[in-house]
Structure formats: structure tokens, C-alpha cells
């Protein structure tokens, strides 16, 4: 299930990034930061009082300047659209500015929960100035100090209280998956076949689909939500402003998905753009299924599928965990397998392994391969525990994290895959020093 999304927005230089860093370092439950795959937006997963959420840091919003400022504002607007809860950060030192008022008006029109936070409010002499911010019409301003941490707990309490109820309820789980790929590989056709109706405009021209459309459906009693996106093009090939915006929305769709279908075109083979698309999904840590479309078109024989699969594995070595499905959106071949595969990958992403079982695995692994030694110092592995799901994330407590060579980390991941079903999902290993 996709996590609630919180976006921090505001004018330039009010302390948004400092607040972002303060929140993601607030609890040890935070696993890792994940840099935004697009410019001027950073993502991280955070947790407060048992509530996990995705946090987005944005660039400063302004309507002045040139193309750079316009791009930053476009990024912020995407974050606002993506968010379930919005934090508008202001600065008590600056008082209420015309730019604050314009941003507040923009947020008010979203009809989403907006929390007004006033930064640099740790000086008692400036507390009275906070009341001026009521004029923005966004409710009670919450005084905070991003640099010193004052008021951050109150802000987080307010944030989690505004989360949509359905996103906190396991009973209402909806498996969200996006269909991504370079233009004209047949993404919309696949979605239409899955839904049984023409919900997305389809044409032979590249970039026919301009927007991301969320569509719920149910299959065998399981609730799904499919997000179909416009094709992702290499940045150098994106000329139109609308097409550039579609690239950004496709990346946002990946962030909102549990599972990603990476669609390849069997008739054209693997292109450089396919690798860029795959990189977006892999870096986001989402479950991935590789879907080879147009399998009805090429001339093939009994070994064609194996040969194409070998090519995929060679070109996408970092996606060795992703299952491959050969389909035809035109004839409907094997498309009926997609929902069950998405459900399987989703279940694999969200499974938890008991620490006792993990430590038995560590013991057996130590008998197979010795731990690495660097500059005369050997890595000692003490125990392992799972700290997160989606993707499955494991903390390994060691004597010195610097001694954890990538090859041994890969060995541990392979051991996990051999002993448990993690098909379709990446696995993260985080070495930590035992205290």
C-alpha cells in the first residue's frame, strides 16, 4: 500500500531543506534517504508515532525570474498535487510577505490539508509576530525552529493527524501499480485491455497520453489501482513543455506505486531510453515486473523468448530480481497474468522475516563464505533484523560498517533470495555498527 505523502513548500530561503533534514533524522525508524530522481525535489521515508510517510522537499516557489525558477515552481506544483498533506513553511523574521500570500492562495485552492509552520520562532521576542500569520487564512500557525528542533514534535503530530483514514487501514489496502516505458511501446493499450474498456486514448503517434490517470479495478477479490503514464523520454529529447511535464508526472507516478510494470517493445528491441526508464523505477526501490509487449509482431521460433530474456538480463543486470512476462496488448496474450503477478510481487515486498530466522541464516552463511578482510581487519557480523518492507530492508549489525564490501552485501542478498521468495522486489542491506 502506498504511503501517505507530505510535501514541504514555501518561498525561497525560509528553511525548507533544514526542516526536511530535521524530520527525517527525528526517529531511528527512518531507514535511508532517497534522492529525488528529478531536479529540485528530494524524497525520504520518515516515521512518527508508528505512522510511516513519504516526505518531499521542494525548491522555493516564486513567480519571478526565468526558466530555472519556472522549472522549480513546476516541480513544487507536482509535489503539491502528489501530496496528501502540505506543510507551508514561512519565516517569522520576514513577517508575512506578498509571496507568502500568493502561495497560500495557491494551496487553499487545492482543498487539501495545509499546515502552516512558522520557522525561526525560537526567539521569545518574536513569538507575538506569529499571530500576523493568521492573515494567510490557513489556520493556527505552528511555531518551529528547523535548526534547533523546537516545535517539530507538535508539527509532526499535526501532520499525521491529517493523514487519510484509508491509508492507515490495512483493511482498505489497494495495490497501486504504474505502467511505464518510453513512448509508443503500448502502455495505454495494456491498460485498456486490463480494464476491458478504452479508458486511455491510444494512437500510433508518440506521446498521445499527456497525463497520468489513476484507475481502480478489482480482480479475483483484490483491489488494484493502475497509473498509466505518458512515455518517459531522455532529457535531451524532451522539447515540448507539456512533454517535459509528462516526464515529471511519470516519475511522480513511480513514487506513488507499489509495483512498476516496465514495458519493452519486442519489435524494436532494447533501447537506451529503456535503461533510463528502468533506472527511475529501480532507484525508487519499487517492485518491478518486466513486460515485453508486441510479442505477436516479430518473427520468432522456439528459442526466441529465451534469447530475448538473455538480452534483457545482460542489459538490466541490476534487475535480476524482476520477473519477465511476454505479452501482446493487441491479441491479449498473457495479459490476464499481470494482476496475479502484481499481487505476488506486492506480497513479496511486504513480507517480514523473524529475526531468529534471519540469524540462523547468518550462521549458515558464515559457513559458506568467510567475511571480508580489509587492511588486516576482518568484518564481524553479529546479527540481522528486518526494519522495513516495501522494499524489504535489513539492518546488519557489525563491528565496522566500512568493512562491509559490496560483494559480501550481494552475497547476503543472494542468501535471502535463496531462502525466501523475494521475486520482483529489490532488497536493501544496511550495515550498522553494534553499540
Curated annotation (Swiss-Prot):
Matches recorded under InterPro entries: G_ENGA, GTP-bd, GTPase_Der, KH_dom-like, KH_dom-like_a/b, P-loop_NTPase, Small_GTP-bd
Primary role: GTPase that plays an essential role in the late steps of ribosome biogenesis.
Name of the molecule in the record: GTPase Der
Subunit: Associates with the 50S ribosomal subunit.
GO molecular function: GTP binding; ribosome binding
Positions of transmembrane segments: none
Lineage: Bacteria, Bacillati, Bacillota, Bacilli, Lactobacillales
Keywords for this protein: GTP-binding, Nucleotide-binding, Repeat, Ribosome biogenesis
Gene3D superfamilies to which the protein is assigned, alphabetical: 3.30.300.20, P-loop containing nucleotide triphosphate hydrolases
Binding-site positions, GTP 1: 10-17, 57-61, 119-122
One Pfam short name: KH_dom-like
PROSITE patterns associated with the record: G_ENGA
